[in-house]
UniProtKB/Swiss-Prot annotation:
Keyword set, alphabetical order: Allosteric enzyme, Cytoplasm, Hydrolase, Metal-binding, Protease, Sodium, Threonine protease
Protein name in the entry: ATP-dependent protease subunit HslV
Subunit structure: A double ring-shaped homohexamer of HslV is capped on each side by a ring-shaped HslU homohexamer. The assembly of the HslU/HslV complex is dependent on binding of ATP.
Function: Protease subunit of a proteasome-like degradation complex believed to be a general protein degrading machinery.
Subcellular location: Cytoplasm
Biological source species: Rickettsia peacockii (strain Rustic)
Length: 182
């Protein structure tokens, strides 16, 4: 069985509503068709919770990229956009980094960014982004809830969307962890 299944075996969702920014992740770690762990933490904070990152893909690769992003953020005085672009440049040009199999969503008060395995930096539309095998389910649910359920908070939308994704994606579970950008 190919290890490529582990590349997308998770759900990470980030959304902004009424100046509240939430990143959510499921807790399942899979290898092929086997669940290795159900309580993993796929979210990390930088700069006293001012920047939060979630990663999908190889755990070791995701952590390596997170560490490199943290260094860039310190170098560029907590400027997330510039740090992400500089990381993407390194990701594309470095022989070792090009082989990493991970994607990240990072957010601060001003930006939600997707960092792809190709070294792309994408700022999504409509204040919502998702990655991983359950990402499209979570993204669709969040967009629908944001459009039609005006009384829900960002946290409620994230939780409902993640639960829908976990119902549909066999590589995601209902052990949802959420972090709020402060």
């Amino acid at each position: 069985m190919s290890d490529n299944l582990s590349l997308h075996g998770t759900t990470i969702l980030c959304l902004k509503k009424n100046e509240e920014i939430i990143i959510a992740a499921d807790g399942q770690v899979s290898h092929g068709n086997t669940v290795l762990k159900s309580t993993a933490r796929k979210l990390r904070t930088i700069a006293n919770n001012k920047i939060i990152a979630g990663f999908a893909g190889s755990t070791a690769d995701g952590l390596a990229l997170f560490e490199k992003l943290a260094v860039k953020i310190e170098q560029h005085k907590h400027n997330l956009l510039r740090s992400a672009v500089e990381l993407a440049k390194d990701w594309r040009s470095d022989k070792y980094l090009r082989r990493l199999e991970a994607m990240m969503i990072v957010a601060d008060r001003s930006h939600i960014l997707i960092l792809t395995g190709n070294g792309d930096v994408v700022e999504p539309e409509k204040n919502v982004a998702a990655i991983g095998s359950g990402g499209l389910f979570a993204l669709s649910a969040a967009r629908a809830l944001m459009s039609y359920e005006n009384n829900l908070t960002a946290e409620e939308i994230a939780l409902k969307s993640m639960n829908i994704a976990a119902d549909l994606c066999v590589f995601s579970n209902h052990n949802i962890i959420m972090e709020k950008v402060v």
